[in-house]
A protein has these predicted regions:
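Membrane-helix interface segments in multi-pass membrane proteins
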Residues: 29-57, 79-112
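Membrane-interface extramembranous regions at the lipid-water interface
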Residues: 1-25, 58-74, 113-138
Length: 138
């Protein structure tokens, strides 16, 4: 799969290697952008645009990886659970706030990362396409 289709298209399947390459590219991109924009304290288009590009790219990579595991893109909504746990932690105190705000989001994100990045692909063609592909730089 050509790199820009792998990073920005919601169609097709992406294998584990492609998932980790895309995840790593987004991480490096955000790391570079964070160091460039670190002095800016006001949210402007220049500071928000890299975040939106990376968010869109990560969403496309995750959805294609879900397709490779023979799952629907609707399952990406499970990412709302850690966010809701974090928000709910502000309404509690003590150990419950720590459990909801730190432990649950980390646990859920770890399980999701294992699901998407470590488990094998669906071996046969499915409704989302042929066997999952990785990145090509052409």
């Amino acid at each position: 799969m050509i790199w820009y289709k792998a990073l920005f298209s919601f169609e097709g399947r992406l294998n584990r290697q492609g998932f980790w390459i895309g995840f790593g590219l987004n991480f490096v991109f955000l790391l570079i952008m964070a160091n460039i924009i670190i002095g800016t304290q006001v949210l402007t288009t220049l500071t928000v645009l890299p975040l939106l590009i990376s968010f869109y790219s990560l969403l496309a990579i995750i959805i294609k990886r879900l397709h490779d595991r023979n799952r629907s893109a609707k399952e990406v909504a499970i990412l709302l659970t850690p966010i809701l746990c974090y928000v709910a932690s502000s309404a509690t105190e003590g150990k419950m706030a720590w459990a909801l705000g730190v432990v649950m989001p980390v646990f859920i994100c770890t399980v999701l990362l294992l699901e998407w990045g470590c488990f094998k692909s669906f071996p046969e063609a499915n409704e989302y396409g042929e066997q999952g592909l990785s990145f090509k730089l052409k």
